[in-house]
């Protein structure tokens, strides 16, 4: 065959006429010998194995915190474990070790019940005199005035003011006879009245004051005696005597009238 011819022929690839022992296996098992190993491309590469790698470029962030040393754990020991939260501990309330701060001692009931200007408090010389506004210091007893209501009259309802409402309205009337709109709204809100009720109260209070002042003026004026006329009594005699001569003179001077006599047959 052709394979045997090539092997028998002297060639520079297979020198020598000797046939290899593998020729008896047939043409399928025979193949060309493996080429010799090629020399390394960089024979001196091993000489650079001792070169250290280049350092990595620095990053923008620094290194993290170092791990805790072993001697720290040995010196301080592990920290106490946090207790697990129970549903009862989540409820609102003071902590177990909470102790309220004691309140400062206040004045006893005896001090509160002591009135102003009593024997325990020093009184000034001016406190002995009663002030002209003593009525302003009166306090209405609880439940004494009753609630604000209305009473029925013949034609309309009349508002019944409580003692507290009248006291506050009197205070305002003492300082100003004519209430302003702003003050009227404030008083109505504080006393539980309407602005119309406050306005009507001030109108009635001014009318009452005018009536009282007029009555005082009449009482202060002294009573005047009635006007006496000068009447002089004259005796009747002289006056008649004075009038009679004049009348007689008039009669004497007058001519006598003729009297006509008529006779009946």
UniProtKB/Swiss-Prot annotation:
UniProt feature, compositional bias: Basic residues: 207-217
GO MF, any single term: sequence-specific double-stranded DNA binding
Localization of this protein: Nucleus
Keyword field: Activator, Developmental protein, DNA-binding, Homeobox, Nucleus, Transcription, Transcription regulation
One GO process term, biological-process aspect: embryonic pattern specification
Subcellular location, principal: nucleus
Distribution of this protein across tissues and organs: Intestinal epithelium.
Region (Interaction with 5-mCpG DNA): 196-207
Protein purpose: Plays a role in transcriptional regulation. Involved in activated KRAS-mediated transcriptional activation of PRKD1 in colorectal cancer (CRC) cells. Binds to the PRKD1 promoter in colorectal cancer (CRC) cells. Could play a role in the terminal differentiation of the intestine. Binds preferentially to methylated DNA.
Name this polypeptide is given: Homeobox protein CDX-1
Native organism: Homo sapiens (Human)
Gene from which this protein is expressed: CDX1
């Amino acid at each position: 065959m052709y394979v045997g011819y090539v092997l028998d022929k002297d060639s520079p690839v297979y020198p020598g006429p000797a046939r290899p022992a593998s020729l008896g296996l047939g043409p399928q098992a025979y193949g060309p010998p493996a080429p010799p190993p090629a020399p390394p491309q960089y024979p001196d590469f091993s000489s650079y194995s001792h070169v250290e790698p280049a350092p990595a470029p620095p990053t923008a962030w620094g290194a993290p915190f170092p791990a805790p040393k072993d001697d720290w754990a040995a010196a301080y020991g592990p920290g106490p474990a946090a207790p697990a939260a129970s549903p009862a501990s989540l409820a609102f309330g003071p902590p177990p070790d909470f102790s309220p701060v004691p309140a400062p001692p206040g004045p006893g009931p005896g001090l509160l019940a002591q009135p102003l200007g009593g024997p325990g408090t020093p009184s000034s010389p001016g406190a002995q005199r009663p002030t002209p506004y003593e009525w302003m210091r009166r306090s209405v007893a609880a439940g004494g005035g009753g609630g604000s209501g209305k009473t029925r009259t013949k034609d309309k309802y009349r508002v019944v003011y409580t003692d507290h409402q009248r006291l506050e309205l009197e205070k305002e009337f003492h300082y100003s006879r004519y209430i302003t709109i702003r003050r009227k709204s404030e008083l109505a809100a504080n006393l539980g009245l309407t602005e119309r009720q406050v306005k009507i109260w001030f109108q009635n209070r001014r009318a009452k004051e005018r009536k009282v002042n007029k009555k005082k003026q009449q009482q202060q004026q002294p009573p005047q005696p009635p006007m006496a006329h000068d009447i002089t009594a004259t005796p009747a005699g002289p006056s008649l005597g004075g009038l009679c001569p004049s009348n007689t003179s008039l009669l004497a001077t007058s001519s006598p009238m003729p009297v006509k006599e008529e006779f009946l047959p």
